[in-house]
Amino acid sequence: MTRVRQSLGDSALAPFRLTDFVRVLVLGFFTLSYPVMLCAEEQDSLGIMPIPANVTHGEGSFVVDGSFGIALEGFQDARLERARQRFLDVLSRETGIPLWRQAALNPSHFFVRTGGLSATVQQLGEDESYHLEIRATKVVLTAPNPLGVLRGLQTFLQLVAITATGFSVPAVTIDDKPRFPWRGLLIDSGHRFVPVPVVKRNLDGMEALKLNVFHWRFADNQGFHIESKKFPLLQEKGSGGFYYSQDEVREVIAYARDRGIRVVPEFDMPCHTTSWFVGYPALASGKDPSQSSAIDPTSRVTYDFLSTFIGEMAALFPDSYFHAGGDECDPKEWESNPRIQEFMRAHAITDGPALQAYFTEKIQKIIAARKKIMVGWDEVLRPDTPRDVVIQSWRGPESLAQAAREGYRGVLSSGYYIDLNQSAAEHYLVDPLGDPSGLSPEQKKRVLGGEATMWTDIVSDENMDNRIWPRTAAIAERLWSAEQVRDIDSMYRRLRSVSQKLVYYGLRHRFIMDEMLERMSGESDPVPLKVLAAVVQPPRLYQRQELRTFSDFTPLNRMDDAVPPESDTAREFNEIAKRISSGQATPEEWRRARAWLTLWRDNDAALQPLLAQSFLTKDLAPVSRNLSQVAAIGLRALDDLQERRTMNGQDRQSTIEFLQRSAKPQAVLLLMVVPSVQLLVEATRTD
């Protein structure tokens, strides 16, 4: 593959000089302006996410062993030193080599050269670029500021691989910077309180994938989960006893800043606010504050309260952006309140959306008076909305594009709702720009990026990690890497590697299912239950809520809570089934397909007695039987295909109808190998 740039040469590895730093920045600027696209095979050889903007492969590899040493040069501060320590901690966990002890004593072979400081409060659009040169004998990471260093260190960690002779990193030269400046993850601590340790380890995962905005949502109808010193009844009466102290919030903000992550708070208003009214009923629109979900936007009491509250929270959160929500506001409480209706008539406010716009205008001014920029969901966008308000879109790329055409900056979340159990591929193909041909260059700049959203309506702190990871890595790549990086097969191959890497950061997504299955079964190693769990998924989108009744206190301890949103086994089997049905499969793929189908057919006999032992697993009995029957059909289809036998047309049709019934949810689960078996059946010949 032709590349447009050359290696920087040996001078890049010489002792640090300012001229070297300037030279790297200049070269990096031109290189990053014209990124080199790696083919899928080259992407796979790196095994990392996100794919960097520009990569040049070299010769050999850099060995990681007990002699490893890393030195900081140029600008230095305590944050860089902590970053070096975290880097060594992760590298030590991956290799098993106690590098955190040795690295301070060993001669350095890894040089981190930082040009200057970052902003005291991290800013939107702050430079995150870096230049990483890895050779067999030396590594040099150069960046204009600590943010770039943080990103480059994560790239190196992802490049570490085990070989027949030890741990090593391929010789490459990388020039990299993000495509979008806003690359976020929303964690909803409003529906359910999310403990600080869970928040922190997900910030570690964000650092690994170069995400840079933690959108922290604190309140909803179900609870108010942050301490207010000005209005203590908010947390005392509205939290159920679970809330973050302001000291804990400051601790998380500092933890995030160390990792190059901004923290943007969200306080959703004027709706989703029932929990506010438990302590402060005068704010409510409805007759019964305990049943009301909308703030009264016509009362002076409301704005006096919110001015003080927003001032308190704006002082607590240093980021320049403040999210005021504004979504899903049902105007029925305003319409049924005579006093509010009289206010609307007196002020020529025609309907609920217009009244919300009146409220939004006042809130935006309160936020701006605290020198913050308001962020809001799609609903806050009205013809008279101030142009500096940032729109977060749950409606989709076209809605975001229209906002950009009207002069607004925006962030996309539609397509990135990771709580809805969609596949990594579905998220991966959603681009914040949508169809970019409909936007001018200036309008494209207004699309700031996107956010994965982890709503906690039916997610607990126990299973949150396997709902967020590893699929969010696919979204992180979409937001960092070039638009043309879209090969789904390559993404999945790299996602497998990245998923394992995330374990070294303390994330628990790979362990959660097994632990929950052990509890469900009462067995220390319920192998047959794991076989079933490997090929089922929770239903997608909102179907799960239609099949099972959830409340704020529903125990999330069933199979649909335990299994990840996407079955790797089913996806891999589907790829093999496609190749078999098209006549392109290798003998090894035929063998693997037969081995899987045999395992699934025979698993039911071992699993049924286990399922009967526990009230948490009894409802899985028909799912297990279904898997056995579907697998038996698959084995017959393999025999027919291999032996070129014909199948009676009527029999095949009845078999397909059975498979279509089997594909429907049972026990709030989807049997994900059914479409693949149907593909095999449809590939057989009929008489």
Regions inferred by a protein language model and the residue ranges of each:
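Sec/Tat signal peptide C-region and signal peptidase I cleavage site
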Residues: 36-40
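N-terminal secretory signal peptides that target proteins for export/translocation
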Residues: 1-20
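Feature activates predominantly on carbohydrate-active enzymes
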Residues: 121-323, 337, 362, 366, ...
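Substrate-binding groove of N-acetylhexosamine-processing glycoside hydrolases
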Residues: 48-51, 56-58, 63-66, 81, ...
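Bacterial N-terminal signal peptides
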Residues: 21-34
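Short, internal active-site loops enriched in acidic
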Residues: 116-118, 269-270, 327-331, 380-382
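N-terminal leader/propeptide and maturation segments of large enzyme subunits in energy/redox metabolism
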Residues: 327-343, 348
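Contiguous, structured surface segment used for ligand recognition
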Residues: 41-180, 479-482, 486-488, 496-501, ...
